[in-house]
């Protein structure tokens, strides 16, 4: 997985955009509970700007983070308290933190879905295994692919988010195309901000495109077992409810 250009161009307003998403929040509590229970140290793979990881460090948990985007890590490092966290710029499938071992490794907000090939998925899981302390836990989440949506070849562009950036409204428009043969969806997001009323900020548009894979339940279990995870729990939401047909996610807790 190369550095996703979308994160290089959108890192500066990533936090503002995703703070406006009501569906986020329960995931941070889920990973915080695991982190506190582990006692640390904790590693987030695909840590981004620190939305989930930074609050763990403020609780006194020893933390480290890995991300492939220099721009996202720059945003992370600007935040108060980030100096206590060891941050590394590396890809999910090839990160190497030497002899460091962690009681909990996690990958939040569907970061695992950025791994487009089976080889990359297995490589990432192998790197996670190599960095787990004895008895350590790996946790991550992906969305549950609803058949009525993945059956669609194309979802036309539609506005799906409005947030405030530097005192002015910014709108996000998203278009999705799917390739069911490869289980990949191409997501194009267009961020639009009008010129400010005083004319000091011109109109702005940023367009980004990235790919996400999707997984079926037993496909995930197979990948985990192939890489040495023998105790795998799966849930359908961040409240640890069982997986049902209409569950929004697959949450994995593996040892």
Protein language model features and the residues they cover:
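Conserved class I S-adenosyl-L-methionine
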Residues: 1-40
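Class I SAM-dependent methyltransferase "Motif I" SAM/SAH-binding loop
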Residues: 46-48
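Class I SAM-dependent methyltransferase SAM/SAH-binding core
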Residues: 50-95
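A short acidic, Gly/Pro-enriched loop at the edge of an enzyme's catalytic core
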Residues: 95-104
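A short glycine-rich, Lys/Arg-flanked "PGG" loop and its adjoining helix->strand segment in the class I
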Residues: 122-134
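Conserved beta-strand signature within the Rossmann-like core of class I S-adenosyl-L-methionine
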Residues: 135-142
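SAM-dependent methyltransferase
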Residues: 142-219
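C-terminal lobe and adjacent flexible extensions of AdoMet/dcAdoMet transferase-like proteins
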Residues: 211-255
